[in-house]
Amino acid sequence: MTAVGIDAIEIRTGKLELDLAETFAPAKGDDPEKYTKGLGLHASSFPDAYEDIVTMGANAAHRLMERKGLTPADIGRIDVATESAFDNSKPVSTYIAGCLEQVFDEDFHHANKGERKFACVAGTQSIDDAYNWIRAGRHRGRSALVIATDTALYARGDPGEATQGAGAVAMLISEDPDVVELSTEQGFGSADETDFLKPNQQFPSVDGKRSVQVYLARMREAVRDFESVAGTIHPDDFTLLPFHTPFPGMVRKAAALAYRHTIRDTEIEEELAEDIGRQPRPEAFDSDEAYVDAMGEYTDELVETDQYRDWYDRVVDPTLEISREVGNWYTGSVHVARASGLKHALENDMDLTGATLGVASYGSGAQAEVHAETVQSGWEDEIAALNVDEQLDNRYSISYEEYEHIHDVHNHDKDTDAEAEAFTPPEGEFVFDGWGRMGERKYRYVE
Ligand code: CAA
C-alpha cells in the first residue's frame, strides 16, 4: 500500500506577542510562576489588526505552495479546521482560496473545499478526510491542503485568558509524503460533554477544571481503543509524543497518566517497584475512592523518578517548545507540537527516519484521537525550511493596554475596526481589507 501522510508543514504565528510573566501577570496581580511553571506558558501570540484566521491560514498555505513549487492544479481539496469561524454558511476555505488566487495565475475551481468543526480535534479530522480521499483513489494524483487556523480568545477575566493564542498550521497531505506516514490504526474516545463550547457566541463558555478532567478521560479511552487495534503500547514505542497542547501543564498531566498506563506489567514497573512499589490494582481495594487515592499517590511518586523524568524529557518536553511561546492555537496545537518535536530533533542532530510518533489529539465537546506516524526520509529538509523562529523573534511585544486594544479589535461585538491601528506594517502577506456589500470579509495581498 502506498504511504499517505504529511508531505509539508508551514506554521504562521500571529504577529503580536503578549509576555505572560512580565506583562500579563503583573496586570492581573498574579505570581508570574503561575504562568511559567504552573501552566508552562511564557507568551501568547495575537493577530495584529489586519490579521485573522483567513490571513494566517492563507499566508501559511502561500509559503507552503511557493516552497514546494506547487500550483493550484496540484491541489485537489482545501479543508480548513477552525473553531473561530465568522460565517455559518460560507467556509473559511473559500476565503483562503480567494486569497491564493490573487497570487497564483490559476484558480482553485476544481478543488473540493470545506470546513471541519469539532473544537481542537478538527485539524486532525481534516487530515483524516484527506487521507481517506487519497486512499479511496479519488484524488487524481493531487494533494490536499489542510489548514488549521484559530484565534483562541477568551472573554477578559475568564481563567482561560492566560492560555490564549493565534496562529495557523498548513499541511500538505499526499502520497509518498516527505514528513510522516499516518498509521491506518486509530483510537477514539468520544462523548457528549459540556466542558468548553461556543453556542453561537465568539468567546467560549468554559468549565476550566472540568475540561482538564474531560481531556484526560477521553484521552484514556482513545489510548485503550488504539491498543485494541494496534496492540499494547510500551513507553519506548514512541520517539516523540505530541499531544493537543492548550497549555504545557495540561500535557504534563496527560503524559504522567500515559506513562503510568503503558508501564503497567512491564519491566519498567518492576524496576520502579523497588523504590515506589507496584501500581495499585483495583481488586486490592474496597472502594473506588480508595483505589483512586492510592493511584494518585503512586502517580505523584512516579513523576519524581529518574525513569519518568528521562522519558518525559526525551519524548514529551521537545513537543512543547513552540507552544510555550505562542499559547493555544486550538485546531493547530497538536500540529505545532509535532513540528516542535521534529524541530528539536533536527537541532539536536537526531536521526528520526523510520522512528514512530504517537499523536494524541483532543477537542472539547469532546473527542480524543490517537494514531501513530512513521517519520519519512524527507523530514529534515522540510523541518529545516520552517521559519517559525524568525517569526517568533519578529513579533511586536504588546503592553497590557495594547493587549486590551487588540482584544477589542478582534471582538466581533465591538465596532473598532474602522479606527483599528496596526502595531506592525504588513509586508509580503495577505491582509484583512474591510467589509464587502453582503457582509463578507475582504482580503488583499500587500507586496
Ligand atoms: N507557581 C507555580 N505553580 C502555580 C502557581 C505558582 N505561583 N500558581 C498556580 N500554579 C499552578 C497550579 O497549581 C495549577 O497547576 P496544577 O493544575 O498542576 O495544580 C496551575 O498553575 C494553574 O493554576 P490554577 O489551576 O489556579 O489556574 P486557573 O484556575 O486560573 O486556570 C485553567 C487553569 C482552568 C486550566 C484555565 O487556564 C482555563 O480555563 N483554561 C481554558 C480551558 C483549557 O485550556 N482546558 C484544557 C483542557 S480542554 C482543551 O484542551 C481544549 C482546548 O484547547 C480549550
Regions found by a protein language model. Give the residues of each.
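Condensing-enzyme catalytic core mediating Claisen C-C bond formation in acyl metabolism
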Residues: 1-51, 160-224, 369-447
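Acidic, glycine-rich active-site loops and adjacent beta-strand->loop/helix elements
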Residues: 10-13, 81-87, 117-122, 147-153, ...
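Phosphate/pyrophosphate-binding loops at sites that engage ATP/ADP/AMP, CoA/4′-phosphopantetheine
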Residues: 60-76, 220-239, 256-260, 278, ...
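Long, repeat-rich segments with strong aromatic
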Residues: 236-254
